[in-house]
């Protein structure tokens, strides 16, 4: 290992220029969530390991290969959260919120997975999500998808995204499909990867998620879930599709889109893009009516989605995130001016203007820095201005320069 101090592999430093896009995505999501009646929730970045083992499944790649697990000094087995839904579900149970249904939660924050780092994928990544608990109606699925679509429109990437949607049916339909899959894959067991042979015993639907090329060939000819759907499941999905069409959200049905865990049911969906190479999914979600019960709580219907902020920010046009605001530079021409500049800069910030105060250096250099910063105005202070209680205002756009009183400065009409 090099002696040079460096980032841990799979992490990133979010520098100021990147933070502009990142913050824009977060603020846009928060704004849209509030419009849909969601309240913000913050859960710890680590939980008891069992929280994720129960929700993600002992056979999942996340639990087996990707979680950051550790034992604390008290001997407790803890895990850095690999996703946000489990923490929200745990909070719902442990905080006794069952009597307050229906509930809608919005969250954002860092998640952790030991994955192979690549474009758009990090070992510490940032995610935002929405969880709607207490509604059995397919209209809740429609509204959840609508929230996601509105966010993608707000950040300017909806034209590059495709909604892919499918149904998993209810528990009865899934059980029938499971039996059909077991029969199909058992007949081709010798062609399955080792991982999928294990999945065949514990959770055959996970084979459909396999990245192994041999498994993919088998999956192409596997029975389709729609062949196992009962009438109740078909009707539920028809209402979801009708709702999406009523809202004018473009979509395509992807019958290969599944979730391997038993608590998922009915609607599953993803928004995908071709702009990020192999990592095409930017937002994914679905209905999980069995999740709370799996964790030891009461049977509670739920539907939600999550999105990687890193990926959304990579797609967002920079001009959308750049605020059109007046930028003021305060320039002290000499020592007296520099001493007074702190007060003038404070007054401008109180008025709500973005203000940069150059605290040292020659005046010429300060003016160059102000120009490079993109300042629209410079407020120049020298000994004469301090004595006369004035300030010289320079408009970088027009080149106009004039001296005004400090009293006039308090209401001066700065504009772009």
From Swiss-Prot:
Reaction(s) this enzyme catalyzes, per UniProt: tRNA(His) + L-histidine + ATP = L-histidyl-tRNA(His) + AMP + diphosphate + H(+)
Signal peptide as annotated in the record: none
Record keywords: Aminoacyl-tRNA synthetase, ATP-binding, Cytoplasm, Ligase, Nucleotide-binding, Protein biosynthesis
Pfam families on file: HGTP_anticodon (PF03129), tRNA-synt_His (PF13393)
GO annotation (BP), single: histidyl-tRNA aminoacylation
Localization (cell): Cytoplasm
UniProt keyword Nucleotide-binding present: yes
GO CC entries: cytoplasm
Broad class of enzyme this protein falls into: ligase
EC number(s) on file: 6.1.1.21
HAMAP family linked: His_tRNA_synth
Official protein name in the record: Histidine--tRNA ligase
Native species: Bdellovibrio bacteriovorus (strain ATCC 15356 / DSM 50701 / NCIMB 9529 / HD100)
């Amino acid at each position: 290992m090099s002696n040079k101090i460096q980032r841990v592999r799979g992490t990133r430093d979010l520098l100021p220029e990147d933070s502009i896009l990142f913050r824009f995505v977060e603020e846009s999501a928060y704004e849209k969530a509030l419009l849909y009646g969601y309240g913000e929730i913050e859960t710890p970045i680590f939980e008891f390991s069992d929280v994720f083992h129960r929700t993600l499944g002992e056979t999942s790649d996340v639990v087996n290969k990707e979680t950051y697990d550790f034992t604390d000094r008290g001997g407790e087995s803890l895990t850095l959260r690999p996703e946000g839904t489990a923490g929200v579900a745990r909070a719902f149970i442990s905080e006794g919120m069952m009597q307050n249904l229906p509930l809608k939660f919005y969250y954002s924050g860092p998640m952790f997975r030991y994955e192979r780092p690549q474009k758009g994928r990090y070992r510490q990544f940032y995610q935002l999500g929405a969880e709607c608990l207490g509604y059995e109606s397919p209209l809740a699925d429609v509204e959840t998808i609508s929230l996601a679509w509105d966010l993608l429109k707000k950040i300017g990437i909806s034209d590059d995204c495709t909604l892919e949607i499918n149904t998993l049916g209810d528990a009865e339909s899934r059980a029938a499909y499971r039996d059909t899959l077991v029969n199909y894959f058992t007949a081709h067991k010798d062609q399955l990867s080792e991982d999928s042979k294990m999945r065949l015993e514990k959770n055959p639907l996970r084979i459909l998620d396999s990245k192994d090329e041999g498994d993919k060939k088998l999956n192409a000819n596997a029975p389709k879930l729609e062949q196992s759907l009962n009438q109740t499941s078909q009707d539920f999905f028809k209402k979801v599709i009708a709702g999406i069409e009523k809202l004018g959200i473009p979509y395509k049905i992807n019958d290969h889109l599944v979730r391997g865990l038993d608590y998922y049911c009915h609607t599953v969906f993803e928004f995908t893009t071709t702009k990020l190479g192999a990592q095409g999914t930017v937002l994914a979600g679905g209905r999980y009516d069995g999740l709370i019960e799996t964790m030891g709580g009461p049977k509670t219907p739920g539907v939600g989605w999550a999105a990687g902020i890193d990926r959304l920010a990579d797609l967002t046009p920079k001009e959308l995130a750049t605020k059109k605001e007046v930028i003021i530079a305060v320039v002290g021409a000499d020592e007296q001016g520099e001493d007074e500049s702190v007060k003038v800069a404070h007054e401008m910030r109180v008025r709500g203007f973005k203000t940069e105060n150059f605290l040292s250096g020659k005046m010429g250099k300060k003016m160059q820095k102000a120009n490079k910063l993109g300042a629209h105005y410079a407020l120049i202070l020298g000994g004469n201005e301090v004595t006369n209680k004035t300030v010289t205002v320079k408009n970088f756009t027009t080149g106009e320069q004039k001296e005004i009183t400090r009293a006039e400065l308090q209401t001066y009409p700065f504009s772009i």
